[in-house]
Amino acid sequence: MCAEATTLDELIKALDDAVSGPADKDRSCMRELLLPEARLSPISKHPDGIYAPHTLTLDEWTEAVRKRGHDVLTEHQVKVKAETYGHLAHLWSTYELRLQPDGPPTVRGINSIQAVFDGKRWRILEILWQVETPDQPIPEKYLP
């Protein structure tokens, strides 16, 4: 059963749970967290040197994760700053990815999450993220 995110803390925990797991994991809980029109957009450097988002639907993201293949991947938000107004929230979160739940982080980055409260629960409209690189380390103010 998927957890309903009635608070932003619950939304972050549910997102970590939905993203984490084997590549072929059932993503129905992820689907419950996202609005139907939600987009998942990693920012990456293109061969021409320009950084740009690559916008995916949940189905496209799920297929990309499946194709990448891994036994288990664990995501954990290590620092989250939330700004809210009415039914709108912006979550700026630093995340870590691990190949083993208790192993060292293999990837870190920043998520920019737009969420909407529908009167009962928080749901995600957009996740835009960028992975940390040697030339763009995560600033200290975003680290735990």
Question: Model-found features: residue ranges?
Answer:
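Hydrophobic pocket/interface hotspot
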Residues: 15, 30, 38, 91, ...
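Short beta-strand edge/turn micro-motifs at domain boundaries
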Residues: 108-137
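Non-catalytic cap/lid and distal C-terminal segments of serine-dependent acyl enzymes
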Residues: 24, 74, 107-110, 137, ...
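Surface-exposed, charged secondary-structure patches
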Residues: 39-102
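Residues that flank catalytic or metal-binding motifs in active/ligand-binding sites
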Residues: 34-36, 78, 109-111
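Short beta-strand segments enriched in hydrophobic/aromatic residues
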Residues: 19, 34, 95-97, 128-129
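Short, low-complexity N-terminal intrinsically disordered segments enriched in polar/charged residues
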Residues: 1-33, 142-144
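A short, polar/proline- and glycine-enriched secondary-structure boundary/capping micro-motif
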Residues: 51-53, 102-105, 133-141
